[in-house]
Amino acid sequence: MASGRDERPPWRLGRLLLLMCLLLLGSSARAAHIKKAEATTTTTSAGAEAAEGQFDRYYHEEELESALREAAAAGLPGLARLFSIGRSVEGRPLWVLRLTAGLGSLIPEGDAGPDAAGPDAAGPLLPGRPQVKLVGNMHGDETVSRQVLIYLARELAAGYRRGDPRLVRLLNTTDVYLLPSLNPDGFERAREGDCGFGDGGPSGASGRDNSRGRDLNRSFPDQFSTGEPPALDEVPEVRALIEWIRRNKFVLSGNLHGGSVVASYPFDDSPEHKATGIYSKTSDDEVFKYLAKAYASNHPIMKTGEPHCPGDEDETFKDGITNGAHWYDVEGGMQDYNYVWANCFEITLELSCCKYPPASQLRQEWENNRESLITLIEKVHIGVKGFVKDSITGSGLENATISVAGINHNITTGRFGDFYRLLVPGTYNLTVVLTGYMPLTVTNVVVKEGPATEVDFSLRPTVTSVIPDTTEAVSTASTVAIPNILSGTSSSYQPIQPKDFHHHHFPDMEIFLRRFANEYPNITRLYSLGKSVESRELYVMEISDNPGVHEPGEPEFKYIGNMHGNEVVGRELLLNLIEYLCKNFGTDPEVTDLVHNTRIHLMPSMNPDGYEKSQEGDSISVIGRNNSNNFDLNRNFPDQFVQITDPTQPETIAVMSWMKSYPFVLSANLHGGSLVVNYPFDDDEQGLATYSKSPDDAVFQQIALSYSKENSQMFQGRPCKNMYPNEYFPHGITNGASWYNVPGGMQDWNYLQTNCFEVTIELGCVKYPLEKELPNFWEQNRRSLIQFMKQVHQGVRGFVLDATDGRGILNATISVAEINHPVTTYKTGDYWRLLVPGTYKITASARGYNPVTKNVTVKSEGAIQVNFTLVRSSTDSNNESKKGKGASSSTNDASDPTTKEFETLIKDLSAENGLESLMLRSSSNLALALYRYHSYKDLSEFLRGLVMNYPHITNLTNLGQSTEYRHIWSLEISNKPNVSEPEEPKIRFVAGIHGNAPVGTELLLALAEFLCLNYKKNPAVTQLVDRTRIVIVPSLNPDGRERAQEKDCTSKIGQTNARGKDLDTDFTNNASQPETKAIIENLIQKQDFSLSVALDGGSMLVTYPYDKPVQTVENKETLKHLASLYANNHPSMHMGQPSCPNKSDENIPGGVMRGAEWHSHLGSMKDYSVTYGHCPEITVYTSCCYFPSAARLPSLWADNKRSLLSMLVEVHKGVHGFVKDKTGKPISKAVIVLNEGIKVQTKEGGYFHVLLAPGVHNIIAIADGYQQQHSQVFVHHDAASSVVIVFDTDNRIFGLPRELVVTVSGATMSALILTACIIWCICSIKSNRHKDGFHRLRQHHDEYEDEIRMMSTGSKKSLLSHEFQDETDTEEETLYSSKH
C-alpha cells in the first residue's frame, strides 16, 4: 500500500534506487523466503490451464477491451456483461466486466459500448445477490492489479463453464464487477520495470496520477478533510466511480494497488492527520480486520507479514494486515469514501513490492493472488442478509436503514428491499427504520462462521397500521432520528461551494435550471407553476432523494425569490443554493441528510417580467418592482383585515394554487431593500404600524432567529445605517406590521390559508447589487439558508389513523390547546406542527370520529413523532339502535387475494405520481391514433380494427343514427364485453357533442388504443380493464364533425347537428333530435354508470353540474371533487389560467367551475345524466382552440392522458355495496339515498356503486316490503368503502308495528262485537213484550175510529172514558188507571 497510497518520504528514495539496481542485475535475485514461498505455491490451479500467451505481456489500451471480451467468451452465454462507467481525461473508456449467472434472460444480447455509462448499461440488478467490486490500476504505474483482474475474469468464466462447484456456486449467488483500470491514461505513460518513481521525476510523469496530475486516491470526499477535494472536472475518473457507487448497492470491495504486500483497512486518515502511527478505528473494525485477514492468510507472502520490499526491508505487518492511518495518513482515499458514504466495505490490497514488474513475473503474481481474490469475494456472504418488505403489499422497501446495536454504522436496503450486513460471528440486535413505517427490531440474531444468517423484516406502514392504546390520554412519543439535520456538519469536511456568480436573466436562468435538472436527475425535478403576464415560465426546482413524490412523513419546504422584480439577491441565492445542494449531495453529510429527509422546492423568480425591466445597481427605485400589469404581487393576496380590490394576477394565482397543492410546512419569501427577517402578521385591523401578533408568535420568532443568527451583519440589528440611520431590529428580526403595514402580503396568506409558516427575509440594503458583490451575499447567507431549512424538522409530526382499517385520515385537524391555529393532515394522514420547546395538549379530530387528546413534550432538537388513532364517532356505534336487527356494516373483504391485489393497485395509483409509473411502464406507440384527425369513415374503420385485433376485450355497438344516418358508435372495453357483470363499476367517456371540437374524439380513440395495446402487457392496465366496464362514445354529433374545418379555432361551423340544433340543449324528456334520443334511450337510461366524462373544446377547464341555474347543487362536494381530480392531473389546467385569446384575463380557481357559472343553459347532457341517469358527469374543455392542427394532437394527448387514466382509477372508489335480505337473497331495485339527496338503485344481484368525495356520508336504504335501513360510511381518497346492507322484512302496517296494529284491531273488533251484542239483546227484549203481554189486539178500523173520536170530542173528560192501553204491567200503572 505504500506507494499505492502516497509518495514516500525523501529519505526512502535511496532505497528505491537500490531496487532499480537489483532489477538491472536480474529479477531472479529475490529474498530466500520469497523463493521458498513460490516453490511451495500450487501450480495446478486453473490459471495454468489458460493459454501460455496470456502471461507474456501487459495488455495496453488497444488490447484491454479484446482481453475482457475474450475472458467473457470463456464462460457460458448470459454470464458476462461488458460496459463502461465513463471515460478518463484523455477519453479512454473505464471498462467494467460484470459476471453473474442469469444475465442472458434479463438483458439483450451484446455488450454496452464505451459511452454507455448509464444505469442500464450493466443490465438490471438481481434480487438476492450481493454486489462485489474489485478496482485495479488506480495509480497508473501500479500494474499488477490490472493484469490480475483480467486473469480473474478468465478464471471465473472458464471455471463456471467447466462446472467447478466452487465457482459455479459463487457466480450463482454473487454479482461480481471487475474494473481492471481506473487510470488508463496513467498506465499508458508508465514504463515496464519501473518499481518506484522511474527517473525520479514527478508522479504524473511516472503514470501514477491522471492526465491532469491528480492522484485519484487523494481526490475523494473525506470526512476528516481540511480542504476541498479537487473539482470533479479535474478527476472524471473519480466522478465516474462515485456515480457508479451511487447507482448501486455494493457490499464489498477491494482496491488493488502495488508498492508493498499487505492488506490495509479503514480509516485511511484521522482528524489529526499525523503522518503515521495513529490507529483510526471504524465502528466495524473487527469486520475489516476479518476481511483483510481473509485475503492475507491466503497469500503466500502477505500472510508472513514481512514483505521485505527493497528500501523497506524492516517493515512488518502483523498477520499481513494494517490499519491505513496507522501505516501512514492518506486524505481523500477511496476506501474511506466507500465506507462513509455508501453501503460498501472496502479494503486496499498491495499486491507486490514492485509497482510495474516485468511481464515475466505476471504468472507468479497471479498464482500468489488467485486464492485470496476468490476468498475475498466469497466473504460477501458473511454476517446477516435478508429482505425488508411492506407487510401489506409484500413489496421490497428500498433505502430502509439497517442499524446494529452497538455499532455506529448503518447500511440501507437495495432496490428490492434486500440487504447484506457484514458482521463477524457474535449475537446482535438489528433494527430497521424507514420513513412512513413502524420501526422493527429483531434481537439475539446469532451470526456464525460461514454463510450469512437470514433475517427478513416485514414493516407495517404507519398509514395503514392500527396503533394500539387509542384511548390513552398521554402519548408515548418518540423522537425521530434525523442524523445531522439539526446539528451542523458532524465532521470537518468542507462542502463544495458554488462558482456560478453572475446575474441570470431569464434565458440564462432557464439554461441553468435545465442543466442541473439534467446533470442530477436522481435528486431534482424542474417544473413550472404557470406563466407570467408576458408568458415566462414560473419555474420551481424540486430537490429530494425521491423527486416528484411526497413521501409520507417527510415535510415539504419552499423558498420563493424575486417577488419584486428589482429585488434580485434572493433569485441569485436560490440558484446558488441549487448548485450547492446538488454538488454536495452524497458527499457532504449535512446536505445529504437534509435532502434525504426533506422535500425542497426552490422558486428563484416569482416575477420574471419585472426582473427584465430592472437595472443593475438599483438601490431604492421601484423600476421593475411590480409585474407587467403594474401590480405589486406582495399586495395582491387575499387579506384578513382589508378587502383587496386589485385583480388577482396570474403570478399570484399560480402561486396560490401551488401552495394549496403541496403540504408545505415552512417557507421564506426572499426580498431586498433592508437586512432583517420579518414575520406575521404583516398588517392589522386598524391599518397602523403596530405589533400584530399571530397565535404562533413564539414559533415565528424562533424560526426567524434561526436565520438571522447565522448572518452576523443581520443579527446586529442595524442594517442600513446610511439609508435608514434610525432603523433598529433587535437580533435582526421584527414583526411585519410593527415595521410597516402591508395588506395583501403573501406570508400572512400562507399562515391563514394553508398549513405553512412563512417569513419574509430582506437580504440586503441594495436591491440590485453589482455582479461582483454576489459572492459576498452567498457567503453571508449560505449558513442561514441551510439552518432555516432545518427548522422544518422542529415541533411535532406524525399520522392520524382510522382505528377501523389503519388508513391515514385526510384533512383531520391537529389543534394545540391555547394556540388558535389548527393544521390539517395530508392525503396519507401525515401532519407537521411547528412548535417551540415545551409541553402541550394536542388534539386530533376529524369529521365522523371521536377526538383524541395527548400531552406532548417538545424538545429543542428533533421532531417528536406522535401518532393518533381515531375511533369512528358514536353515531356509527349507535347505528344498531337506529337500524334494528338488519344493520348495515362497512366491510373490507380481503379474503380474495386478487381483490386485495387490486385494492393495493388502486391505492398505489392514487398515490402521488402513481399514475406516472403506470404511464412509464406502458407502450407509447400511439402514432396510428394521433398523426391525423379521423373523418367519420376513418373513425368507423379504426373502431372496427380495434375489435378485430382485440375481440376478447372489445365490443362495438350502434347506439342509433344521426340526422344524416351516420352511426353513433359505442365501444365497450372490458375482459367480458358481452357478459353482464353488475358488480363491476361502469364508466363512460363521450366526446363530439359539438362537431367543431373534435379533439375529444381523437383523445378517446387514443385512450381506446392505449388500453388495448397495453392489455396483458402492463399489469396495471390489465387489472383496470379486467375490473371495469369502459364505454367509449367518440362522436355524438358525426354530422357536425363532417362539416367542421381543421385549424379553425373559433368557427362555430359544425357545432350543431344537421338540423342546426345544439345537442347540448336538447337533453330533456321531450328530446327532439335523433342523436339525443339515441344517447338518452340507449346509453343514459339503459345502462347503470358510476361516472361519465364528456370532452369538449373552446377553453381549458372542467365544469360540473348543473349547467342550468339552480339555487343549490345536490352532492356538490362530490361533483367538484371529480372535476378537481381531472384538473389536478392535467399539467396546466389546475392553474386556472386558460389564457385563451378571446379571454386572456380569465381566472378559473383550480381550473374547475360549476357549469352554470361558466356558461348557463338548459337541456345539457350532464344535467340529464345526473338527474335522470343518476350518474355524475363532468365536462372537460381540452383546448382553447376548437379545431387545432393535427400536429398538436400528441401534446394534447400527453396533457390529458394522466387525467383520463385518473378517472379509470377514481371509478373504483366511493362506496360499493351489496343489498340482501336476512336469508341472503339479493334485493334489486332497492333505493340507496346518500346524504338525503343522491339516489341510486341496486342492480341485478343487489349491487350498487356510487362515487362520493372523501369523508363521512349518511346512507338510507329503502326497499318495498322491508324495513328502512340507516348507516354511515367513511370514504377514503384512495380506496372504495364496501358496504353490505341486510334488510329485515317490513312487519309494519300503516307505518305502525304489526303487534300494535293487531292489538288495536283486535280490541276494536271486540268492542264492535260487544256493541252489536248489546243492541241485539235490547231488540230481543222488546220483541218478547209483544209475545207475553195481555191486551186487546186492535184492528185497523178501530184505530181509525179512535182517532176520529179523539179529534171530535169537546170535553177532556171524554178522553178518560177510554182506557189507555200500555204494554207494561206494573202495579203502579194499574192503580193509576183504576183511579180514573
From Swiss-Prot:
Q: Which residues carry this modification: Phosphothreonine?
A: T1368, T1370
User: What is the pH dependence described in this protein's record?
Assistant: Optimum pH is 6.0-6.5.
Q: Which positions are lipidated as S-palmitoyl cysteine? A: C1317, C1321, C1323
Identify the stretch annotated as signal peptide in this record.
1-31
Main location per UniProt?
membrane
Checking InterPro entries in the record gives: CarboxyPept-like_regulatory, M14_CPD_II, M14_CPD_III, Peptidase_M14, Peptidase_M14_domain
- Which residue windows are transmembrane per the record? 1300-1320
User: Which tissues and organs express this gene's product?
Assistant: Highly expressed in placenta, pancreas and hepatoma cells. Lower levels found in skeletal muscle, heart and colon carcinoma and melanoma cell lines.
Q: Which cofactor does it need?
A: Zn(2+)
PROSITE patterns cross-referenced by the UniProt entry: CARBOXYPEPT_ZN_1, CARBOXYPEPT_ZN_2, PEPTIDASE_M14
Q: Where does Zn(2+) 1 bind?
A: H139, E142, H257
| Entry text on domains | There are 3 carboxypeptidase-like domains. Only the first two domains seem to have kept a catalytic activity.
Its name, as the record gives it, is Carboxypeptidase D
Q: What is the organism lineage in this UniProt record?
A: Eukaryota, Metazoa, Chordata, Craniata, Vertebrata
Gene name, per UniProt, is: CPD
